[in-house]
Regions:
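Periplasmic-binding protein-like
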Residues: 30-32, 105-109, 192-229, 253-261
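Extended ligand-binding regions for polar small-molecule ligands
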Residues: 49-57, 129, 211-244
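Ligand-binding cleft/hinge of the Venus flytrap
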Residues: 49-60, 101, 125-127, 136-158, ...
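Extracytoplasmic small-molecule ligand-binding "clamshell" domains
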Residues: 21-91, 95, 247-251
Length: 265
């Protein structure tokens, strides 16, 4: 090998080593919330994919840790994670976290059986009904305030699957859930026959925005958030942001079906 080729080879190796060193790792705590966040879906779900790409364009390699939602919050708040995703804004969370620019627009609706002639315009229209709900879950301050008036009863369980099972058994009348999350749970856990029994009311219970939260306990969070927000604004401006959700509607984040095992007989 000539000295010139050796020199060029060393320069290339040095360049690649520098790029690898600059690829910093970000650890982000998340909860399971398919199709937005799920260890079982392609790219860990559409929001995980979006977050990964946003940070990759800023030179970071993102690693997600799926935890129960309360642990995802508390572990990030103490600085064990660089960020946590995704969360509704609540004033009390500002003590622990910086909030990014809005990352996800959600639409919460009431799921119900098609056999139920259900209509609503005001919360009082729900009086006397039994609702399903998620553990420690907020459906927005206005509906939370209505629930506190005890005009309806709400039976909270840990998963969407459990809530839909109760709905099918008529143990609850309504189940408030984010629309894409609800239909993803139905597709994943229920037969086509059971899916066909359930619909949602078109009037949204809540149109909500969710955010990436970065812990105030970490000194670098404000600078990291500024870079994230700038890149997110670029994605929205160029239309790239919308392509992730177009892919979601086309089923591109669904897990690959497991092929049947071949028999030796």
């Amino acid at each position: 090998m000539t000295p010139r080729r050796l020199y060029l080879g060393l320069c290339l190796l040095l360049c690649l080593s520098t790029q690898a060193a600059e690829q910093k790792v970000l650890n982000i705590s998340v909860g399971d919330w398919p199709p937005y966040l799920s260890a079982d879906m392609k790219h860990n779900g559409v929001i995980a994919h979006l977050i990964s790409d946003l940070f990759a364009d800023e030179g970071y390699d993102v690693r997600f840790q799926f935890l129960p939602w309360p642990r995802a919050y508390s572990a990030a708040a103490t600085g064990r994670f660089d960020a946590t995703a995704v969360w509704m804004h609540k004033a009390e969370r500002e003590a622990d976290f910086h909030f990014s620019a809005p990352l996800l627009d959600e639409q919460f609706v009431f799921f119900h059986l098609k056999t139920l002639p259900f209509d609503w315009h005001h919360f009082d229209d729900l009086t006397g009904m039994t609702l399903g709900g998620g553990l420690e879950y907020s459906y927005g301050p206005q509906f939370d305030e209505f629930l506190a008036q005890n005009k309806v009863s709400i039976e909270r369980v840990s998963t969407a699957m459990q809530n839909f099972e109760k709905l099918l058994k008529e143990r609850v009348v309504l189940y408030p859930q984010e629309m894409n999350v609800g239909y993803a749970a139905l597709r994943s856990h229920f037969s086509e026959e059971d899916q066909a029994k359930i619909t949602h009311h078109p009037t949204p219970l809540l149109i909500n925005r969710s955010y990436l939260m970065l812990p105030k306990s970490l000194e670098g969070s404000p600078a990291l958030m500024a870079r994230f927000n700038k890149r997110l604004a670029d994605y929205r401006k160029t239309g790239r942001y919308d392509r992730y959700f177009a892919d979601l509607q086309q089923g591109k984040y669904q897990p690959e079906p497991i092929p049947p095992m071949e028999s030796d007989y």
